[in-house]
A protein has these predicted regions:
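Mobile cap/lid helix-loop segments that gate and shape the active-site cleft of serine hydrolases
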Residues: 44-45, 49-53, 67, 106-151, ...
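Alpha/beta-hydrolase-fold catalytic nucleophile elbow
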Residues: 25, 86, 111-112, 162
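Cap/lid segment of the alpha/beta-hydrolase catalytic domain
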Residues: 1-63, 68, 73, 119-122
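Acidic catalytic loop of the alpha/beta-hydrolase fold
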Residues: 166-170
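Conserved hydrolase catalytic core segment
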Residues: 100-106
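Glycine-rich nucleophile elbow surrounding the catalytic serine of serine-hydrolase chemistry
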Residues: 87-97
Length: 181
């Protein structure tokens, strides 16, 4: 947050205002990275190993998030009917995915991560460079559902999606198509 978001740590802000906050880095991101540093080659190697074991890095992250939400909801001082999640960028993807795959989450906000596969699977987009893109891939899911379809599973609950018009990772045409889905 030091270089982004005006230096405001969202979790700290919520905690200072009385909310219970659990902020978990995805495996191979932030504090759960490698001691020698995280790079795209290492992330791709991790993803490859998950696939060889019949799973995926993306599925692991999703289940890690579900277990984290279940833990928060189980705390005696937490109202399990008021558990929510919020995320920016990769965290936004994790937020809407988490809300879609567990009833533990009652409300979510996702800032700057929504698009369609058609607009992300281009030669110049970050999604095709490997590395961290594998953290969001669930084998065979795109065969049935695109990103906005998956996100819509969360939408019977209060759900906020917010995207910027100049986000270099998410072409505005794809954002508009996703919102029209």
């Amino acid at each position: 947050a030091a270089g982004c978001y005006d230096g405001q740590y969202t979790g700290d802000y919520f905690a200072e205002h009385g909310y219970v906050v659990l902020s978990i880095d995805a495996l191979f991101w932030g504090e759960r990275g490698r001691k020698e540093g995280v790079n795209y080659d290492g992330q791709q190697a991790l993803a490859s190993n998950f696939l060889q074991m019949g799973s995926s890095w993306g599925a692991f992250i999703n289940m890690d998030d579900v277990r984290s939400a279940e833990f928060v909801a189980s705390l005696p001082f937490v109202d399990k009917d008021k558990v929510g999640c919020v995320g920016f960028s990769m965290g936004a993807y994790r937020s809407w995915m988490l809300s879609a795959i567990t009833d533990c989450i009652k409300v979510s906000a996702s800032i700057c991560w929504m698009n369609t596969t058609e607009h992300l699977m281009t030669l110049t987009n970050n999604q095709n460079k490997g590395g961290s893109a594998y953290s969001m891939l669930i084998p065979n899911l795109r065969r049935y559902l695109d990103y906005p379809h998956t996100a819509c599973i969360a939408c019977p609950k209060p759900t906020l999606f917010f995207n910027g018009s100049r986000d270099k990772l998410f072409p505005i045409e794809g954002v508009k198509d996703a919102y029209d889905t």
